[in-house]
Structures are given as structure tokens and as C-alpha cells.
Amino acid sequence: MARIAGVEIPSNKRVVIALTYIRGIGIKKAQNILSDLKEIDINTKVEDLKEQHLIAIRNKIQNGNYLVEGDLKREVALNIKRLMENGSYRGLRHRKGLPSRGQNTRNNARTIKGKRRTKNTVANNKK
């Protein structure tokens, strides 16, 4: 297995698919990276790549202004924190743990709202 951007990419897959194992790189970005590197064919498997090709891919990702892995997570977290500090509607929804993109919450939204909690009502307290 080759290590690129701190991620072990599988050696039995094609390079374009293996690059998508890196957070922040999808199919399109992987194709763009490989199209800039003329000597690497998109259909080549990772195990068939030479060390110089792996170094070229690493350099392209590092120097190509791609936000990957930890940097991407940090950027997203800072964006959410900025929204919450601004007091914007989206920030308030994040703070309350509710969907921030306009979805209905009457019936669904269990993923973001979390597990149901029973309220302390008079009926629950009587025993």
C-alpha cells in the first residue's frame, strides 16, 4: 500500500479510484491530478506505479492547493464556528443541533437531532 497525504491507499485498485480514499479528493479532482501528470495513465493500478510516480502525485497534491484530510476538516470546523459566532440562522441551527439547510423537522431529521429523549412530565414522575 502506498501512503499519500497521510492515507494508505489500496494497491489493488486503479489510481483514479485509489486517490478518492483521501478525504477531499473525489473522482473529478483525481482525474485532474492525473491529467496534469502526463506520464501516469488513469487506468494504471497503484501496485504498478513506480516510486517516482508516487512522489509526483504527492507533490501535485501538496503543491496544488488542494485541501485534504486534516486541513479540510479544520477549514470546515472553522467555517461552522464562524457561522455560530456571527449569530446567523445557519449558525443557530448548528448550535441547536438541527438541520441547517431547510429540511422539515416535524417527523424526520433523526440523524442530526440524535436519539429521542423523553421529557420529564408529571405523568412520568408519578409512580
From Swiss-Prot:
TM region positions: none
GO biological process terms, semicolon-separated: translation
GO CC annotations on file: cytosol; small ribosomal subunit
Xref: SUPFAM superfamilies: S13-like H2TH domain (SSF46946)
NAD among keywords: no
Keywords: Ribonucleoprotein, Ribosomal protein, RNA-binding, rRNA-binding, tRNA-binding
InterPro entries xref list: Rbsml_uS13_C, Ribosomal_uS13, Ribosomal_uS13-like_H2TH, Ribosomal_uS13_bac-type
GO molecular function: rRNA binding; structural constituent of ribosome; tRNA binding
Family designation: Belongs to the universal ribosomal protein uS13 family.
Subunit details: Part of the 30S ribosomal subunit. Forms a loose heterodimer with protein S19. Forms two bridges to the 50S subunit in the 70S ribosome.
Function: Located at the top of the head of the 30S subunit, it contacts several helices of the 16S rRNA. In the 70S ribosome it contacts the 23S rRNA (bridge B1a) and protein L5 of the 50S subunit (bridge B1b), connecting the 2 subunits; these bridges are implicated in subunit movement. Contacts the tRNAs in the A and P-sites.
HAMAP family in the cross-refs: Ribosomal_uS13
Protein name: Small ribosomal subunit protein uS13
